[in-house]
Structure formats: structure tokens, C-alpha cells
């Protein structure tokens, strides 16, 4: 019995080893999407409304923030005037309103992005990342952000943006 077992073990040892999984070079779609993320960040820093708007499929995309319960409570508690509308947990907007408010601001604005995850089949994609919104050196808010993208004849475009936000409880 020992002889046949040894022969099998010996034969198996000469078989080619299974291919090991190595990190693959990024595919072209992922590289293009990563460049889109960089252009998003650069347009905010440069207060480039036209460049920012070119990143989107159209102006009326889904654009929603979900604030943490604590952020909503703090904001509403800070309001002294009872006629000012109270904040809600989920708020909408648009990419144009966002970039135009940044462009009007006299202060430097930026969005730091980390832990970027891109999932794509080459036609549609999801981008998921951690962000911190900065006003100068002050970390104003942070959370998770998700984009839905589509590949058009003009390249990748953002079709929806949804994010969570924790507002900084400490003022600047």
C-alpha cells in the first residue's frame, strides 16, 4: 500500500501549482473612474463650476445627504429664531447648487477622499469612499459617499450621489 501512495504523492508533486492570485493592474475603466474622482476633488478646490458640472450625466441627478441624528439635533438646537425651518435627516440638492455655493465662498474648500472602492462591469459603476469636507483647515463634516456612474460616449459620468454626514460638533 505504501508504494502506490508514494507514487501518487510523487506524481502530484510534479503537477503544475495552481495559479496564485496576484493584484492585477487596474483595468482601463477603473483608471478612468479614478481620474474622474480626482477631477471632482480638483474642481472643488479650484471652484471650477463648469469643470465640476461636466462630471455629471445631467444637472438633475439624485443628490441626497443623510445626516446623522446627532447632527440634526445639534443644528436644530442651535437655531434661536423659531421661524427658521428646522433641518431634516435627509436633504436633497444638486451638483450645481453645491459647486456654486463653494465658488461663492471666500474660504478655501476641499473634499478629502480615502478608501476608494470601485466596482464596474465597464458600462456601469459604483464608487464608494470615505470623505471629509474641509473649510480651510477645519474638518466641517465627514462620512461615506456613494456614486452611481454610467459610461457614455463622452466617458464616465456621475448619475447619482448619496452620502452620509456627521457635522463637526466643534465649531471652527
Language-model features, listed with the residues they occupy:
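A mature extracytoplasmic/lumenal domain signature
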Residues: 56-59, 67, 129-133, 162-163
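Short, low-complexity N-terminal intrinsically disordered segments enriched in polar/charged residues
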Residues: 20-59, 172
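Surface-exposed, charged secondary-structure patches
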Residues: 32, 76-139
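Short, solvent-exposed secondary-structure junction/capping segments
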Residues: 41-42, 54-73, 77-80
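Non-catalytic cap/lid and distal C-terminal segments of serine-dependent acyl enzymes
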Residues: 46-47, 61-62, 96-98
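Positively charged n-region of N-terminal signal peptides that target proteins for export
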Residues: 1-4
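Bacterial N-terminal signal peptides
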Residues: 7-17
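Short beta-strand edge/turn micro-motifs at domain boundaries
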Residues: 126-128, 140-170
Amino acid at each position: 500500500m505504501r508504494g502506490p501512495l508514494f507514487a501518487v504523492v510523487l506524481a502530484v508533486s510534479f503537477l503544475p501549482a495552481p495559479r496564485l492570485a496576484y493584484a492585477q493592474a487596474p483595468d482601463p475603466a477603473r483608471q478612468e473612474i479614478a481620474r474622474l474622482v480626482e477631477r471632482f476633488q480638483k474642481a472643488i478646490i479650484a471652484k471650477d463650476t463648469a469643470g465640476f458640472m461636466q462630471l455629471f450625466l445631467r444637472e438633475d441627478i439624485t443628490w441626497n445627504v443623510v445626516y446623522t441624528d446627532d447632527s440634526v439635533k445639534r443644528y436644530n438646537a442651535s437655531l434661536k429664531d423659531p421661524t427658521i425651518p428646522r433641518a431634516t435627516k435627509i436633504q436633497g440638492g444638486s451638483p450645481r447648487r453645491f459647486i456654486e455655493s463653494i465658488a461663492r465662498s471666500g474660504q478655501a474648500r476641499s473634499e478629502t477622499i480615502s478608501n476608494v472602492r470601485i466596482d464596474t462591469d465597464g458600462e456601469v459603476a459604483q464608487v464608494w469612499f470615505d470623505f471629509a469636507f474641509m473649510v480651510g483647515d477645519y474638518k466641517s463634516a465627514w462620512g461615506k459617499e456613494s456614486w452611481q456612474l454610467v459610461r457614455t460616449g463622452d466617458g464616465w459620468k456621475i448619475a447619482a450621489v448619496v452620502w452620509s454626514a456627521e457635522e463637526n460638533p466643534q465649531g471652527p
